[in-house]
Amino acid sequence: MCIRDSIGMQIIIEGLALAAFNLAKQTSNDPVFRDMLYLIIRDEARHVTFGVNYLEEYLKNLSKDELDERAMFAYEACVVMRGRLLSAEVYEKFGWNVEESLEFQSKTDVTNNFQHLLFTRVVPNLSRIGLITDKVRPLYDELGVLDYESWPTDGDIDWASLKQPLDLSETA
């Protein structure tokens, strides 16, 4: 597997999945669905953990230029992912004022909560593996997500508990 694929899939896309499943869990009133999501989130967190553990060691062996290239790739993936969460194409297709619609959408609780869930999963892991470099740090700051860099965990990965057998006490 190409390292870009691993960064893109196991850090960025799996982080997106964690955010989506967490949002669904937060907004659902169905206890069975919430229990199912708990298990799915745990499984997704294991995928991210594998990627973090692998990439953390692998990236240490790259040259500064190679690391900066991968850091820029991860940043660009975050920008694309953030942009895909907004529905500019839909607004345009329906003939709505795109700027007004995007401004409205960016202020909704659902959008803000999802963006928070998304970047609190992705940014701490990018930092942990060494992809928040001096070159891209200002770009993440402009994106408004650099505050998450120093979070000790992404909210789903409890490194110690993932080594333990599955605890079903949190389910119904």
Predicted regions and their residues:
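Short capping loops/turns at secondary-structure boundaries
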Residues: I7-E14, Q26, D30
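Extended, helix-rich structural scaffolds rather than catalytic motifs
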Residues: K64-A172
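Inter-helical turn/loop segments and adjacent helix faces that build the functional surface
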Residues: F21-L39, N53-E69, V98-L102
